UniProtKB/Swiss-Prot annotation:
Binding site for substrate: N10, K12
EC number(s) given by UniProt: 5.3.1.1
A cellular component term, taken from the record's GO annotations: cytosol
Disulphide linkage map: none
Keyword Isomerase: yes
Name of protein: Triosephosphate isomerase, cytosolic
One MF term in the entry's GO annotations: triose-phosphate isomerase activity
Keywords: Cytoplasm, Gluconeogenesis, Glycolysis, Isomerase
CDD domains per UniProt: TIM
Catalytic center residues: H96, E166
PANTHER family hit by this protein: TRIOSEPHOSPHATE ISOMERASE (PTHR21139), TRIOSEPHOSPHATE ISOMERASE, CYTOSOLIC (PTHR21139:SF34)
Enzyme class at the top of the EC tree: isomerase
Coiled coil start-end: none
């Protein structure tokens, strides 16, 4: 069984109700490959989750951009995994580099979040990736392996995990990892999973790429053997997101 292509759209902290309705209209009218070719998940800000869930076409799914590390309670401003499950939100993005950098989320904290979200029945897009300094010092794989290990130490069943490799230096900067750079890290990450989790998990877990993915570079990136899709930032708010979804065809035609 091949790994189904996965395209996630991370809207980050963007949008008004009117803008969200426009994006939904574009997505709902789009002619894209069927669900057996590509899995599409969009991740609006919390306040728009019910609107998007109710209005989005049924073959696309919805993700939250974060959730709390344990059961709800006296944690002002947080949203628990149980609340997302209660709203039938199937996916959550955890460990995004912006949260690691701006909010100080450690590898261990992200690992705990992933484990708790999975335990409540959510599917998780778990983000890993290195900074420019780390890449230039040659420590990319050490960093990515440590981030992945913190998840592997806490998670036994990887069925509902998608790993998103997002080189921090390529997020929102217009810089993009070359197809060869992306493939190299994805292949090394898969090798790490094979050695430290299991060959089965390595073969079946989707590793997607994030970092300035757009309509112009998505086909070449998506054609790499270990790139199983994308986590798209800014471009997911634009019509070119449709072109990125269509890049799934490169795998079907390979």
């Amino acid at each position: 069984m091949g790994r189904k292509f996965f395209v996630g759209g991370n809207w980050k902290c963007n949008g008004t109700a009117e803008e969200v309705k426009k994006i939904l209209a574009t997505l709902n009218a789009a002619d894209v490959p069927s669900q057996d070719v590509v899995e599409v998940v969009v991740s609006p800000p919390y306040v728009f989750l019910p609107l998007v869930k109710n209005e989005l076409r049924p073959d696309f799914h919805v993700a939250a951009q974060n959730c709390w590390v344990k059961k709800g309670g006296a944690f002002t401003g947080e949203v628990s995994a149980e609340m997302l499950v209660n709203l039938s939100i199937p996916w959550v993005i955890l460990g995004h580099s912006e949260r690691r950098a701006l909010l100080g989320e450690s590898n261990e904290f992200v690992g705990d979040k992933v484990a708790y979200a999975l335990s409540q029945g959510l599917k998780v897009i778990a983000c890993v990736g290195e900074t420019l300094e780390e890449r230039e010092s040659g420590s990319t794989m050490d960093v990515v392996a440590a981030q992945t290990k913190a998840i592997a130490d806490r998670v036994k069943d990887w069925t509902n995990v998608v790993v998103a490799y997002e080189p921090v230096w390529a997020i929102g900067t217009g810089k993009v990892a070359s197809p060869a750079q992306a493939q190299e890290v994805h292949a090394e990450l898969r090798k790490w999973l094979a050695a430290n989790v299991s060959p089965e998990v390595a073969a079946s877990t989707r590793i997607i790429y994030g970092g300035s993915v757009n309509g112009a570079n998505c086909k070449e990136l998506g054609g790499q053997p270990d790139v199983d899709g994308f986590l798209v930032g800014g471009a997911s708010l634009k019509p070119e997101f449709i072109d990125i979804i269509k890049a799934a065809e490169v795998k079907r035609n390979a």
